[in-house]
Regions:
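Catalytic core of nucleotide-activated saccharide and alditol-phosphate transferases
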Residues: 96-167
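N-terminal pre-catalytic "stem/leader" segment of glycosyltransferase-like enzymes
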Residues: 1-120, 124
């Protein structure tokens, strides 16, 4: 697949010394989280031409396993995480990213359901930006309670008559 090939290429090269901007994506290899990452690779040539930016990638599980990253010294590090990442793993991940990319802007790329913000509050003091993969078309729905913790659980709970507390 094209996406896998582009990911492998981005994981195999360090940043060049002449890059104006260096974007390191620390990502999960699974299909749904990768759908958030593919556009960065698809438009990598345009990012380089227009902004002098290089895009590289590292596997989240390798970083958490303390495997050395090929690309370090990024100016921006954008990372994904599992929704159930432990506090210890989250703190260790961010500490490692900051140590290997001093002065970098740290961004969380949240690939979860549109109304699932379970990690936003605990990441707030640790990162510079929190980016959702997608948002609800009708943004007024964000102020309304759901049955369960996301719009997806709300839809299933209502459809199948599952009793969940409003949140």
């Amino acid at each position: 697949r094209r996406a896998q090939k582009l990911r492998a290429q981005a994981m195999a090269r360090p940043f060049s010394s002449g890059a104006k901007a260096k974007l390191l994506l620390v990502t999960q290899p699974e299909r749904i989280p990768q759908s958030q990452i593919y556009p960065f690779h698809h438009y990598a040539a345009d990012l380089k031409r227009l902004y002098g930016a290089e895009v590289r990638e590292a596997d989240l599980w390798d970083v958490l396993g303390n495997k050395p990253m090929v690309a370090t010294g990024a100016t921006v590090v954008a990372f994904q995480s599992p929704f159930d990442i432990s506090d210890d793993d989250l703190f260790r991940l961010i500490e490692s990213l900051r140590a290997q990319n001093p002065g970098a802007i740290i961004v969380c790329l949240d690939w979860f359901a549109p109304t699932d913000l379970r990690n936003a509050a605990r990441m707030d003091p640790l990162i510079d930006f929190y980016v959702k993969k997608h948002v609800l078309r009708d943004r007024s729905l964000y102020g309304k309670p759901t049955l369960g913790d996301t719009n997806l659980t709300d839809a299933f709970n209502r459809r199948f008559g599952i009793d969940e507390p409003e949140q």
